[in-house]
Amino acid sequence: MRDSVLSVIFALALFLECYTPSMAIPMGKMEDTALEQDTLDSLLNEEVADKNPDSVRSGSSKIIVLADSGMWKNLNRGLPLYKLKAAAAGLDRALTLDRREADQDLSPSISIVRRDTMRCMVGRVYRPCWEV
């Protein structure tokens, strides 16, 4: 039901867009509108020139800046700000030293056979937990 309502609204919007008032204006009236637009543009350009003459250059050149999408991906290593903060906090924790005594095992409650068969994720590979 929702899809049909959305398609009817979309079709209605397209139908109404075809009958805009500019389509019904006679050709002579359209030329007057173009003259009014040119006059408005020239007035606006004069206002800008009066406010800051250094910023207005001769001619009507436009500068379009296009950014490389790869540049945006590499910005902040491709991570959002909240993930960068979490990664920095994790790096601080990773740099701390963790000491274990030689006689200290992983857990005395886990039997040796079970400990050897347990698998832990190391990177992208499952390895026995005692190798970690």
UniProtKB/Swiss-Prot annotation:
One of its GO terms (molecular function) is type 1 melanin-concentrating hormone receptor binding. GO terms for biological process: chemical synaptic transmission; neuropeptide signaling pathway. One of its GO terms (cellular component) is synapse. Residues 1-24 form the signal peptide. It comes from the Eukaryota. Keywords: Cleavage on pair of basic residues, Disulfide bond, Hormone, Neuropeptide, Signal. Pituitary gland. Produced in neurons of lateral basal hypothalamus which project both to the brain and to the neural lobe of the pituitary gland from where MCH is released. It holds the Pfam family Pro-MCH. Disulfide bonds join 120-129. Belongs to the melanin-concentrating hormone family. Plays a role in skin pigmentation by antagonizing the action of melanotropin alpha. Induces melanin concentration within the melanophores. May participate in the control of the hypothalamo-pituitary adrenal gland axis by inhibiting the release of ACTH. PANTHER family: MELANIN-CONCENTRATING HORMONE, PRO-MCH. This is Pro-MCH 2.
